Design a protein with these regions (language model features):
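Buried, small/hydrophobic-residue-enriched core segments of structured protein domains
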Residues: 1-127, 132, 157, 162, ...
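Gly/Ser/Thr/Ala-enriched C-terminal appendages of enzymes
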Residues: 96, 119-142, 147-231
Length: 231
């Protein structure tokens, strides 16, 4: 089990920086931070995954692309850039079910694992493990990285459930870096246009989608529904 702090969207905080500077001495399970500046300053490993914005822009920012294939365009471009050092793929930008249509043997082999960021983590994990097995890949060689509104208790429960089934890692942000007595706001930053064109994140659960144009969301969903029903 490994954990990393996800601080890319957090305000400047002396407390967060202090925690980062001491965490590396506390436990071997702390592997780094997604804040590149703090990683450099505190001699930590900069670690993270793809952002939703990357998949949204690469897959939907070109009007010639069918947005239901956003994950394919994103993974194809990523692999061309990084070769065999591709890290962790993000699954839920236009739903995990659609992602798995493009997560073929090549990509499943080249990426070291996948990231959960919405929906039921246990259902998602079992679905991913089955997909690896269907492709003939041993899921114990791959990483399931969980990053959806985690605290230590949730992370421990997930780890105990998937231990022995796959490698397990966690990206824990708000709970570690903004653990005040005030309930945190549910705020995220996402791109809404690329090249003058609407783009959207759908997610695996209601309430985590992002787009300013409901007509584009409807169009994207129609494209996905057609693909899921005809391929």
């Amino acid at each position: 089990c490994a954990s990393a702090e996800s601080l890319r969207l957090r305000p400047n905080s002396l407390n967060a920086e202090k925690r980062l500077s001491t965490a590396k001495y506390c436990s071997s399970t702390f592997v780094g931070t997604s804040n590149v500046y703090l990683a450099m300053k505190n001699n930590l490993i900069p670690t993270g995954t793809q952002a939703h914005e990357y998949i949204m822009c690469v897959g939907q920012g070109n009007h010639k692309h069918n947005p239901a294939y956003s994950n394919w365009y994103a993974m194809e471009s990523w692999v061309k850039e990084y070769g065999i050092l591709n890290g962790t793929a993000l699954t839920d930008t236009i739903t995990t079910d659609c992602f798995l249509r493009d997560f073929n043997l090549t990509y499943a082999t080249l990426f070291s694992g996948v990231r959960h960021d919405s929906g039921d983590p246990y259902e998602w994990g079992e679905k991913i493990i089955k997909h690896y097995k269907d492709l003939g890949i041993d899921p114990q060689t791959k990483t399931l990285l969980f990053s959806d509104s985690l605290n230590f208790k949730k992370a421990d429960e997930i780890f105990r459930y998937f231990r022995g089934k796959a490698k397990v890692a966690f990206g824990i942000g708000t709970y570690i870096s903004n653990d005040t007595d005030v309930e945190p706001l549910n705020i995220v930053m996402k791109v809404t246009k690329c090249n003058g064109q609407d783009v959207a994140k759908l997610s695996d659960v209601e309430g985590k989608g992002m787009c300013k144009n409901p007509e584009y969301v409807e169009y994207l969903q129609r494209c996905i529904n057609w693909r899921m029903g005809n391929e």
